[in-house]
Amino acid sequence: MFSSHSLSYKLSSLSTEASASSGNNTLSTIQEFSGFHNVISSVCTHTETHKPKKKRGLPGNPDPDAEVIALSPKTLLATNRFVCEICNKGFQRDQNLQLHRRGHNLPWKLKQKNTKEQQKKKVYVCPETNCAHHHPSRALGDLTGIKKHFCRKHGEKKWKCEKCSKFYAVQSDWKAHTKICGTRDYRCDCGTLFSRKDTFITHRAFCDALAEESARLHSTSSSNLTNPNPNFQGHHFMFNKSSSLLFTSSPLFIEPSLSTAALSTPPTAALSATALLQKATSLSSTTFGGGGQTRSIGHHRHLTNVNEFLGVDRVMMTSASSSEYDQLVVDGFTSTWQKADRLTRDFLGLTGHGGHVSVRPGDMLEYAGGVAFPMSAYDTESHDHSFQKAYDHLGFSGAHRM
Protein backbone atom coordinates (compact mmCIF):
# COMPACT_ATOMS: atom_id res chain seq x y z
CA MET A 1 0.00 0.00 0.00
CA PHE A 2 2.77 2.34 0.92
CA SER A 3 4.65 1.45 -2.17
CA SER A 4 1.71 2.29 -4.46
CA HIS A 5 1.33 5.74 -2.86
CA SER A 6 5.03 6.43 -3.22
CA LEU A 7 4.94 5.31 -6.84
CA SER A 8 2.01 7.59 -7.65
CA TYR A 9 3.76 10.47 -5.90
CA LYS A 10 6.89 9.93 -7.98
CA LEU A 11 4.88 9.79 -11.20
CA SER A 12 3.08 13.01 -10.35
CA SER A 13 6.36 14.76 -9.55
CA LEU A 14 7.83 13.58 -12.83
CA SER A 15 4.82 14.86 -14.78
CA THR A 16 5.08 18.21 -13.00
CA GLU A 17 8.75 18.49 -13.86
CA ALA A 18 8.08 17.51 -17.46
CA SER A 19 5.37 20.12 -17.81
CA ALA A 20 7.59 22.74 -16.25
CA SER A 21 10.46 21.86 -18.55
CA SER A 22 8.18 21.88 -21.58
CA GLY A 23 6.90 25.28 -20.53
CA ASN A 24 10.42 26.58 -20.21
CA ASN A 25 11.33 25.16 -23.61
CA THR A 26 8.28 26.77 -25.17
CA LEU A 27 9.13 30.09 -23.58
CA SER A 28 12.72 29.90 -24.79
CA THR A 29 11.52 28.95 -28.28
CA ILE A 30 9.19 31.94 -28.36
CA GLN A 31 11.99 34.22 -27.23
CA GLU A 32 14.33 32.85 -29.88
CA PHE A 33 11.69 33.26 -32.57
CA SER A 34 11.03 36.82 -31.52
CA GLY A 35 14.76 37.58 -31.62
CA PHE A 36 15.05 35.99 -35.05
CA HIS A 37 12.08 38.05 -36.22
CA ASN A 38 13.78 41.20 -35.01
CA VAL A 39 16.94 40.27 -36.93
CA ILE A 40 14.95 39.66 -40.11
CA SER A 41 13.09 42.94 -39.75
CA SER A 42 16.34 44.83 -39.21
CA VAL A 43 17.88 43.21 -42.29
CA CYS A 44 14.82 44.07 -44.37
CA THR A 45 14.92 47.66 -43.15
CA HIS A 46 18.63 47.87 -44.00
CA THR A 47 18.05 46.59 -47.53
CA GLU A 48 15.20 49.01 -48.04
CA THR A 49 17.33 51.97 -47.04
CA HIS A 50 20.13 50.91 -49.47
CA LYS A 51 18.23 50.28 -52.65
CA PRO A 52 20.30 50.18 -55.82
CA LYS A 53 20.27 53.28 -57.91
CA LYS A 54 17.96 53.29 -60.86
CA LYS A 55 19.82 53.00 -64.11
CA ARG A 56 19.55 55.84 -66.53
CA GLY A 57 17.55 55.11 -69.61
CA LEU A 58 19.32 54.66 -72.89
CA PRO A 59 19.56 57.89 -74.88
CA GLY A 60 17.48 58.14 -77.98
CA ASN A 61 13.75 57.56 -77.55
CA PRO A 62 12.24 60.03 -79.96
CA ASP A 63 8.65 60.79 -80.66
CA PRO A 64 7.21 58.47 -83.33
CA ASP A 65 5.90 61.50 -85.17
CA ALA A 66 9.32 63.25 -85.18
CA GLU A 67 11.14 63.97 -88.40
CA VAL A 68 14.26 61.81 -88.78
CA ILE A 69 17.21 63.60 -90.36
CA ALA A 70 20.37 61.80 -91.51
CA LEU A 71 23.43 63.95 -92.13
CA SER A 72 26.74 62.88 -93.62
CA PRO A 73 29.87 63.06 -91.45
CA LYS A 74 31.20 65.95 -93.52
CA THR A 75 28.02 67.96 -93.11
CA LEU A 76 27.75 67.03 -89.45
CA LEU A 77 31.27 68.19 -88.66
CA ALA A 78 31.18 71.26 -90.85
CA THR A 79 31.84 74.47 -88.95
CA ASN A 80 31.48 77.06 -91.70
CA ARG A 81 28.11 76.37 -93.20
CA PHE A 82 27.04 79.90 -92.35
CA VAL A 83 29.89 82.44 -92.43
CA CYS A 84 29.87 85.94 -91.03
CA GLU A 85 30.89 88.51 -93.68
CA ILE A 86 32.58 90.72 -91.09
CA CYS A 87 34.86 88.35 -89.16
CA ASN A 88 34.63 85.25 -91.36
CA LYS A 89 33.50 83.16 -88.41
CA GLY A 90 31.57 80.11 -89.43
CA PHE A 91 28.42 78.71 -87.88
CA GLN A 92 26.58 75.49 -88.39
CA ARG A 93 23.13 76.90 -87.90
CA ASP A 94 21.64 80.00 -89.44
CA GLN A 95 20.04 81.12 -86.20
CA ASN A 96 23.45 81.24 -84.55
CA LEU A 97 24.71 83.42 -87.38
CA GLN A 98 21.77 85.82 -86.97
CA LEU A 99 22.47 86.10 -83.27
CA HIS A 100 26.14 86.74 -84.04
CA ARG A 101 25.25 89.56 -86.43
CA ARG A 102 23.76 91.49 -83.54
CA GLY A 103 27.27 91.93 -82.13
CA HIS A 104 28.34 93.71 -85.28
CA ASN A 105 25.26 95.98 -85.27
CA LEU A 106 24.09 94.35 -88.45
CA PRO A 107 20.48 93.66 -89.28
CA TRP A 108 19.46 90.23 -88.10
CA LYS A 109 16.30 88.22 -88.34
CA LEU A 110 15.28 84.98 -86.72
CA LYS A 111 13.24 82.51 -88.67
CA GLN A 112 9.74 82.39 -87.39
CA LYS A 113 8.01 79.05 -87.06
CA ASN A 114 4.33 78.53 -87.35
CA THR A 115 2.34 76.43 -84.93
CA LYS A 116 2.44 73.27 -87.01
CA GLU A 117 6.23 73.41 -87.45
CA GLN A 118 6.73 73.95 -83.74
CA GLN A 119 4.73 70.86 -82.94
CA LYS A 120 6.78 68.62 -85.23
CA LYS A 121 10.22 67.78 -83.82
CA LYS A 122 13.42 66.88 -85.62
CA VAL A 123 15.70 64.01 -84.60
CA TYR A 124 19.13 63.12 -85.96
CA VAL A 125 20.66 59.72 -86.48
CA CYS A 126 24.36 58.86 -86.33
CA PRO A 127 26.06 58.52 -89.72
CA GLU A 128 28.00 55.45 -88.56
CA THR A 129 26.10 52.36 -89.72
CA ASN A 130 27.43 50.12 -86.92
CA CYS A 131 26.38 52.56 -84.20
CA ALA A 132 23.29 51.92 -82.08
CA HIS A 133 22.07 55.48 -82.73
CA HIS A 134 21.99 54.89 -86.46
CA HIS A 135 18.52 53.36 -86.13
CA PRO A 136 15.64 55.89 -86.15
CA SER A 137 14.27 54.49 -82.91
CA ARG A 138 17.49 55.56 -81.16
CA ALA A 139 17.91 58.91 -82.88
CA LEU A 140 19.05 61.90 -80.83
CA GLY A 141 16.87 64.98 -80.64
CA ASP A 142 19.61 67.62 -80.73
CA LEU A 143 21.98 68.52 -83.54
CA THR A 144 24.73 69.47 -81.09
CA GLY A 145 24.19 66.22 -79.21
CA ILE A 146 24.55 64.06 -82.31
CA LYS A 147 27.62 66.01 -83.32
CA LYS A 148 29.32 65.46 -79.93
CA HIS A 149 28.29 61.82 -79.96
CA PHE A 150 29.88 61.27 -83.35
CA CYS A 151 33.08 63.03 -82.30
CA ARG A 152 33.37 61.14 -78.99
CA LYS A 153 32.64 57.67 -80.34
CA HIS A 154 33.83 57.77 -83.91
CA GLY A 155 35.94 60.91 -84.30
CA GLU A 156 39.57 61.79 -83.78
CA LYS A 157 40.76 62.90 -80.35
CA LYS A 158 42.77 66.02 -81.11
CA TRP A 159 42.47 67.95 -77.85
CA LYS A 160 45.24 67.12 -75.39
CA CYS A 161 45.60 68.00 -71.72
CA GLU A 162 49.08 69.29 -70.94
CA LYS A 163 49.00 68.10 -67.32
CA CYS A 164 47.97 64.47 -67.67
CA SER A 165 48.35 63.93 -71.44
CA LYS A 166 44.74 62.88 -71.95
CA PHE A 167 43.09 63.36 -75.33
CA TYR A 168 39.56 64.52 -76.02
CA ALA A 169 37.55 64.62 -79.21
CA VAL A 170 35.22 67.41 -78.07
CA GLN A 171 36.61 70.79 -77.16
CA SER A 172 34.04 71.38 -74.43
CA ASP A 173 35.08 68.13 -72.73
CA TRP A 174 38.70 69.20 -72.90
CA LYS A 175 37.93 72.58 -71.35
CA ALA A 176 35.93 71.00 -68.54
CA HIS A 177 38.77 68.59 -67.82
CA THR A 178 41.47 71.25 -67.72
CA LYS A 179 39.55 73.13 -65.04
CA ILE A 180 39.56 70.21 -62.59
CA CYS A 181 42.74 68.41 -63.67
CA GLY A 182 45.07 68.06 -60.69
CA THR A 183 42.52 69.23 -58.12
CA ARG A 184 40.62 65.98 -57.45
CA ASP A 185 43.18 63.29 -57.99
CA TYR A 186 43.25 59.90 -56.29
CA ARG A 187 46.78 58.69 -55.80
CA CYS A 188 47.60 55.00 -55.41
CA ASP A 189 50.54 53.71 -53.38
CA CYS A 190 52.20 52.61 -56.61
CA GLY A 191 52.27 56.23 -57.83
CA THR A 192 49.41 56.12 -60.33
CA LEU A 193 47.01 59.07 -60.38
CA PHE A 194 43.28 58.77 -61.02
CA SER A 195 40.77 61.52 -61.56
CA ARG A 196 37.78 59.24 -61.05
CA LYS A 197 37.08 57.40 -57.83
CA ASP A 198 35.62 54.27 -59.42
CA THR A 199 38.69 53.65 -61.55
CA PHE A 200 40.88 54.29 -58.51
CA ILE A 201 38.98 51.70 -56.44
CA THR A 202 39.25 49.11 -59.21
CA HIS A 203 42.97 49.72 -59.60
CA ARG A 204 43.56 49.72 -55.84
CA ALA A 205 41.99 46.28 -55.42
CA PHE A 206 44.17 44.87 -58.18
CA CYS A 207 47.27 46.61 -56.84
CA ASP A 208 46.70 45.31 -53.30
CA ALA A 209 46.24 41.75 -54.55
CA LEU A 210 49.46 42.02 -56.54
CA ALA A 211 51.33 43.38 -53.51
CA GLU A 212 50.09 40.52 -51.31
CA GLU A 213 51.16 37.96 -53.88
CA SER A 214 54.62 39.48 -54.21
CA ALA A 215 54.99 39.62 -50.41
CA ARG A 216 53.99 35.96 -50.14
CA LEU A 217 56.53 34.94 -52.77
CA HIS A 218 59.22 37.03 -51.04
CA SER A 219 58.50 35.42 -47.66
CA THR A 220 58.62 31.95 -49.22
CA SER A 221 61.97 32.63 -50.87
CA SER A 222 63.42 34.13 -47.68
CA SER A 223 62.28 31.12 -45.65
CA ASN A 224 63.96 28.81 -48.16
CA LEU A 225 67.18 30.79 -47.82
CA THR A 226 67.14 30.78 -44.01
CA ASN A 227 66.16 27.09 -43.76
CA PRO A 228 68.06 25.14 -46.43
CA ASN A 229 67.59 21.46 -47.11
CA PRO A 230 68.87 19.54 -44.04
CA ASN A 231 70.06 16.68 -46.25
CA PHE A 232 72.96 18.80 -47.44
CA GLN A 233 74.07 20.11 -44.04
CA GLY A 234 76.15 17.06 -43.17
CA HIS A 235 78.13 17.14 -46.41
CA HIS A 236 79.76 20.54 -45.94
CA PHE A 237 82.94 20.75 -43.93
CA MET A 238 84.08 24.15 -42.72
CA PHE A 239 87.60 25.03 -41.69
CA ASN A 240 89.56 28.25 -41.36
CA LYS A 241 92.10 29.68 -43.76
CA SER A 242 95.07 29.00 -41.49
CA SER A 243 94.44 25.27 -41.52
CA SER A 244 93.82 25.21 -45.25
CA LEU A 245 97.18 26.87 -45.96
CA LEU A 246 98.98 23.94 -44.37
CA PHE A 247 98.30 21.82 -47.41
CA THR A 248 99.15 24.25 -50.18
CA SER A 249 102.92 23.64 -50.13
CA SER A 250 102.79 19.90 -50.80
CA PRO A 251 100.07 18.66 -53.14
CA LEU A 252 97.98 15.64 -52.29
CA PHE A 253 97.02 13.02 -54.81
CA ILE A 254 94.36 10.37 -55.04
CA GLU A 255 93.73 7.97 -57.81
CA PRO A 256 90.53 6.87 -59.62
CA SER A 257 90.86 3.29 -58.33
CA LEU A 258 90.26 4.33 -54.74
CA SER A 259 87.27 2.68 -53.18
CA THR A 260 84.48 5.00 -52.16
CA ALA A 261 84.01 2.97 -49.00
CA ALA A 262 87.41 4.10 -47.76
CA LEU A 263 86.33 7.75 -48.01
CA SER A 264 82.83 7.31 -46.64
CA THR A 265 83.72 8.09 -43.04
CA PRO A 266 81.37 10.62 -41.47
CA PRO A 267 82.81 14.16 -41.24
CA THR A 268 83.68 15.60 -37.88
CA ALA A 269 82.20 18.80 -36.60
CA ALA A 270 85.51 20.65 -36.13
CA LEU A 271 89.20 19.71 -36.26
CA SER A 272 92.24 21.58 -35.09
CA ALA A 273 95.14 22.45 -37.33
CA THR A 274 97.27 19.64 -35.83
CA ALA A 275 94.54 17.09 -36.41
CA LEU A 276 94.10 18.26 -39.98
CA LEU A 277 97.84 17.96 -40.59
CA GLN A 278 97.94 14.47 -39.13
CA LYS A 279 94.98 13.37 -41.19
CA ALA A 280 96.47 14.78 -44.39
CA THR A 281 99.83 13.14 -43.77
CA SER A 282 98.16 9.82 -43.03
CA LEU A 283 96.32 10.07 -46.34
CA SER A 284 99.61 10.89 -48.04
CA SER A 285 101.23 7.84 -46.47
CA THR A 286 98.53 5.56 -47.80
CA THR A 287 98.92 7.12 -51.24
CA PHE A 288 102.74 7.26 -51.54
CA GLY A 289 104.20 4.99 -48.83
CA GLY A 290 104.79 1.24 -48.93
CA GLY A 291 107.24 -0.93 -50.75
CA GLY A 292 104.65 -3.26 -52.13
CA GLN A 293 102.54 -0.53 -53.72
CA THR A 294 102.82 0.36 -57.39
CA ARG A 295 103.26 4.09 -57.97
CA SER A 296 104.19 6.43 -60.75
CA ILE A 297 104.99 10.13 -60.34
CA GLY A 298 105.09 12.03 -63.62
CA HIS A 299 104.82 15.56 -64.90
CA HIS A 300 101.02 15.44 -65.32
CA ARG A 301 99.89 15.18 -61.71
CA HIS A 302 96.66 16.85 -60.72
CA LEU A 303 95.70 18.26 -57.37
CA THR A 304 92.60 17.13 -55.59
CA ASN A 305 90.48 19.26 -53.35
CA VAL A 306 91.58 19.15 -49.71
CA ASN A 307 88.07 19.82 -48.53
CA GLU A 308 86.87 16.65 -50.19
CA PHE A 309 89.65 14.69 -48.48
CA LEU A 310 88.24 15.78 -45.13
CA GLY A 311 84.71 14.46 -45.20
CA VAL A 312 82.95 15.12 -48.51
CA ASP A 313 81.77 11.88 -49.97
CA ARG A 314 82.49 12.98 -53.56
CA VAL A 315 86.10 12.91 -54.78
CA MET A 316 86.95 14.97 -57.85
CA MET A 317 90.10 13.87 -59.59
CA THR A 318 91.79 13.68 -62.95
CA SER A 319 94.80 11.69 -64.06
CA ALA A 320 97.08 11.80 -67.07
CA SER A 321 97.08 8.01 -67.33
CA SER A 322 94.64 6.29 -65.00
CA SER A 323 95.97 2.86 -65.92
CA GLU A 324 99.15 3.59 -63.92
CA TYR A 325 97.18 3.68 -60.68
CA ASP A 326 95.08 0.57 -61.03
CA GLN A 327 97.11 -1.31 -58.42
CA LEU A 328 96.88 1.36 -55.71
CA VAL A 329 95.33 0.10 -52.46
CA VAL A 330 94.30 2.26 -49.54
CA ASP A 331 95.01 0.48 -46.27
CA GLY A 332 93.99 3.08 -43.70
CA PHE A 333 94.67 6.49 -42.33
CA THR A 334 97.71 5.64 -40.20
CA SER A 335 100.61 3.24 -40.40
CA THR A 336 102.92 2.01 -37.68
CA TRP A 337 106.63 1.49 -37.59
CA GLN A 338 107.14 -2.06 -38.72
CA LYS A 339 109.34 -3.01 -35.77
CA ALA A 340 108.88 -5.53 -33.05
CA ASP A 341 107.40 -3.08 -30.56
CA ARG A 342 104.84 -1.48 -32.92
CA LEU A 343 104.36 1.32 -30.42
CA THR A 344 105.41 4.31 -32.49
CA ARG A 345 103.06 6.00 -34.97
CA ASP A 346 104.44 6.88 -38.39
CA PHE A 347 102.73 10.18 -39.24
CA LEU A 348 105.18 10.93 -42.05
CA GLY A 349 104.48 7.66 -43.86
CA LEU A 350 108.07 6.49 -44.09
CA THR A 351 107.43 2.79 -43.45
CA GLY A 352 106.25 0.09 -45.75
CA HIS A 353 104.24 -3.04 -45.26
CA GLY A 354 107.15 -5.30 -44.37
CA GLY A 355 109.06 -5.69 -41.16
CA HIS A 356 111.83 -3.30 -42.15
CA VAL A 357 111.92 0.39 -42.70
CA SER A 358 111.69 0.96 -46.41
CA VAL A 359 112.02 4.53 -47.55
CA ARG A 360 112.54 5.95 -51.01
CA PRO A 361 114.73 9.04 -51.20
CA GLY A 362 112.31 10.83 -53.47
CA ASP A 363 109.62 10.57 -50.80
CA MET A 364 111.90 12.07 -48.16
CA LEU A 365 112.74 15.03 -50.34
CA GLU A 366 109.10 15.53 -51.22
CA TYR A 367 108.10 15.69 -47.57
CA ALA A 368 111.07 17.86 -46.67
CA GLY A 369 110.92 20.49 -49.37
CA GLY A 370 108.06 19.70 -51.65
CA VAL A 371 110.44 18.89 -54.54
CA ALA A 372 109.41 16.00 -56.74
CA PHE A 373 112.17 13.96 -58.26
CA PRO A 374 111.60 11.54 -61.13
CA MET A 375 111.63 7.99 -59.91
CA SER A 376 113.68 6.91 -62.86
CA ALA A 377 116.61 8.86 -61.45
CA TYR A 378 116.68 6.65 -58.36
CA ASP A 379 116.14 3.30 -59.98
CA THR A 380 119.72 2.98 -61.18
CA GLU A 381 122.57 1.49 -59.19
CA SER A 382 124.76 4.60 -59.51
CA HIS A 383 122.93 6.49 -56.73
CA ASP A 384 122.89 3.77 -54.08
CA HIS A 385 125.91 4.95 -52.11
CA SER A 386 124.95 8.62 -52.06
CA PHE A 387 121.56 8.03 -50.48
CA GLN A 388 122.76 5.21 -48.23
CA LYS A 389 124.67 7.79 -46.22
CA ALA A 390 121.57 9.88 -45.82
CA TYR A 391 119.65 6.92 -44.46
CA ASP A 392 122.38 5.99 -42.02
CA HIS A 393 122.61 9.55 -40.82
CA LEU A 394 118.89 9.64 -40.08
CA GLY A 395 119.13 6.46 -38.05
CA PHE A 396 117.09 4.18 -40.29
CA SER A 397 118.11 0.58 -40.44
CA GLY A 398 117.10 -2.42 -42.36
CA ALA A 399 117.06 -3.36 -45.94
CA HIS A 400 115.77 -0.78 -48.27
CA ARG A 401 115.12 -0.84 -51.89
CA MET A 402 116.19 1.87 -54.25
Swiss-Prot record:
The modification Phosphoserine is found at residue 72. GO terms for molecular function: DNA binding; DNA-binding transcription factor activity; zinc ion binding. Its main location: nucleus. Residues 47-66 are annotated as: Disordered. Zn(2+) 2 binds at residues 188, 190, 203, 207. Residues 196-208 are annotated as: SHR-binding. One of its GO terms (cellular component) is nucleus. Keywords: DNA-binding, Metal-binding, Nucleus, Phosphoprotein, Repeat, Transcription, Transcription regulation, Zinc, Zinc-finger. It is found in: Nucleus. Zn(2+) 1 binds at residues 161, 164, 177, 181. A zinc finger (C2H2-type) spans 82-104, 124-154, 159-183. A motif (Nuclear localization signal) lies at residues 146-153. A zinc finger (CCHC-type) spans 186-209. GO terms for biological process: regulation of DNA-templated transcription. Pfam families: C2CH-3rd_BIRD-IDD, C2CH-4th_BIRD-IDD, C2H2-2nd_BIRD-IDD. PANTHER family: PROTEIN INDETERMINATE-DOMAIN 12, SERINE/THREONINE-PROTEIN KINASE RIO. Probable transcription factor. This is Protein indeterminate-domain 12. The lineage of its organism: Eukaryota, Viridiplantae, Streptophyta, Embryophyta, Tracheophyta. The gene is IDD12.
